[in-house]
Design a protein with these regions (language model features):
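Core nucleotide-handling region used for phosphoryl-transfer chemistry
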Residues: 2-232
Length: 232
C-alpha cells in the first residue's frame, strides 16, 4: 500500500475538539481554554477515567484517510508510520461513520519517551452518524479490534472532591510516564458516551509547567522516537 492509495479528500475531516485546562493547570498558555473555578462539579460523584496525556501529534484515522488535528493530511515525514505502517492494516476495520483519534509518537516532541512499544496510541473514537464520542470501554474494545494500544490509564472510578483529585494528580505527576521519563500531564473524562454539546463539561486536562509547543525550529530538527518492540 502506498500513499497514493489514501484518499485525502473524499471525506470532510472531523477534527478533535480542544480540551479545556483544569482551572489550576500550570501548563496553560495564554491562548488555551481554561475551566471555571467550579469546574469539578461536572465530575464529582460520576464514574470517570483519567489517562496519561502523551506528548505527540493528535491524529485522526478513518477508513479512507488519515490527517492531523489541523485537518491537513499527514504528509509530513514524521507521519510516515501512520500512512505506511498503520493505516493499511486498520482501515478495513473502521466503519464509514467512525473516526479513530490517537497520539502519533513517531517524532520526539518535548518529551523523549524510552519505553514505547507502538508509535500510535488511541484516546478517542467519534461516530459521525450517531454524533457521539464512544464510551471509554468502547474505545478500549475498539483498540483491541485494531490491535493498537490506548493511552495509559491511571484511574477508573469515582472521585468526590477536588482536593482528592488534585492529591492524586500531584502524585501521578511526581511519577514517571508509563514510557519512562516525565509525564506531560493527564486527561480526565466521563467514562460514558459524550455528546458534542456536552464536551466542555465532560473532559478536561492538566498539563505540566513549562510545556514546550512545537514550532518551525522543531520541524527543522525533529528526530524519530525509539521503539523497544516495533511490531510493524
Amino acid at each position: 500500500m502506498t500513499d497514493n492509495n489514501i484518499n485525502m479528500t473524499a471525506i470532510k475531516p472531523q477534527s478533535f475538539p480542544r480540551i479545556k485546562h483544569m482551572y489550576n493547570s500550570p501548563g496553560r498558555s495564554p491562548d488555551d481554554l481554561r475551566s471555571d473555578k467550579d469546574w469539578f462539579k461536572s465530575f464529582s460523584g460520576k464514574y470517570i477515567v483519567i489517562k496519561e496525556k502523551l506528548d505527540g501529534e493528535n491524529t485522526g484515522i478513518t477508513n479512507i484517510s488519515c490527517y492531523a488535528r489541523s485537518k491537513i493530511p499527514t504528509l509530513n515525514p514524521w507521519s510516515v508510520n501512520i500512512r505506511r505502517d498503520i493505516f493499511p492494516f486498520v482501515k478495513d476495520l473502521i466503519s464509514d461513520d467512525e473516526i479513530v483519534f490517537g497520539e502519533n509518537l513517531y517524532a520526539v516532541h518535548s518529551i523523549k519517551y524510552n519505553r514505547l512499544s507502538s508509535y500510535f496510541h488511541i484516546f478517542a473514537v467519534y461516530n459521525t452518524k450517531l454524533e457521539v464520542w464512544y464510551s471509554w470501554s468502547d474505545v478500549e474494545m475498539f483498540a483491541k479490534i485494531l490491535d493498537l494500544p490506548t493511552v495509559p490509564v491511571l484511574f477508573k472510578g469515582i472521585i468526590n472532591s477536588e482536593k482528592d483529585l488534585m492529591d492524586k494528580i500531584n502524585y501521578w505527576m511526581s511519577q514517571p510516564s508509563a514510557y519512562g521519563v516525565e509525564k506531560e500531564g493527564v486527561v480526565m473524562r466521563l467514562a460514558g458516551e459524550i455528546k458534542p454539546e456536552d464536551w466542555n463539561n465532560s473532559i478536561v486536562k492538566y498539563v505540566r509547567e513549562n510545556h514546550v509547543q512545537t514550532d518551525k525550529r522543531w520541524e527543522d530538527k525533529w528526530e524519530r522516537a525509539e521503539l523497544i518492540n516495533n511490531n510493524f
